[in-house]
Every structure is written in C-alpha cells, then in structure tokens.
Amino acid sequence: MILINISLIFPIANSSGRSFFFTALLISVFTDIFALAFGKLLGKRFIYPSISPNKTLEGTLLGLLIPSFLFLFLGYLFIEVEIIGLEVFSEFLVISLFIDSYGYLITFFIILISSLASISGDLLASKSKRLMGIKDFGNLLPGHGGVLDRIDSHIICIPVFFIFYSLI
C-alpha cells in the first residue's frame, strides 16, 4: 500500500516523475486496449471464466506483447532516429531512459512485466468483485461502473513500473 502511495505522489514532484507516470499509464491503457481488441477478434480460449468471463488467452498474450514491442519501437525512434519534432514526445515517455540504462532486451521485459501487472490488477479487481457478489465497484460512470473499475489495471502496473524506474 505504501508503494502505491509513493508511486502516485512521486510523479507530481518533477517533470521526469510526470513522464514516468504518463508512460506507466500508457503501458496499462495499451495493454487493456490490445487485450480487449484482439480478445474479441481472435479469442477462442477463455483463461479465467470464473473470474473474468471474457478474458481470452489470445487477447491476453497479444495485450502483453504488442505494447512491449510498440514502446520498444518508440524508444528506438527516440534514440536512434532523428525525426524533427519527435524529441517533444520523448519528453513524455521514459522508455528511452530505460533503453539507455538497461538496453533493448531488458527494457522489453520491463514493459512486458508492467503489462502483466496491468492484467493482474484487472483480474484482482474482478476476483474481488466476484467475492463481494457485485458486478461493478460503483455506478458513477454509466456503463463502466465506478472510478475503481476504470483504474483497476493501473493499481498494480504503476507501482511495478515505479520499482524499475527507481532503479535507474
């Protein structure tokens, strides 16, 4: 719990903190988007039907891999390719910082682990709701549940990404 609080307070402190937070948030969002899209398109095997009945193996795997390759590619563009105007975006993402510190392969696994943490947060929230016998954590957002339903995947992803970020 303390780690979650630190990871949410730290980004406000300085611009690199905001970049960290923005990057972690994007990893989590892209993981959700790609897992959902490819799960609906290609999904045949359900992985946890009792916890999250619509999660498929295909969606989960592509939800993990595509953001990992996408962010690695963005990091490559920021470091290796000089495109006018692209340096503005590198200020918002800390991926190039990871690549400089760890190299491409380790950075790939950091993003992959962060994506896995995102999916774990979603599954943890789903399991909690099943245990409580509710569909959503609230009804603030019609059709989407409560605020916690919107950020469940970020709850674990951001602290995990923060651990790697703090080691740089």
What residues fall within each predicted segment?
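Interhelical loop and helix-boundary elements at the membrane-water interface
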Residues: 1-156
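Juxtamembrane boundary at the C-terminal end of a transmembrane helix
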Residues: 77, 81, 162-168
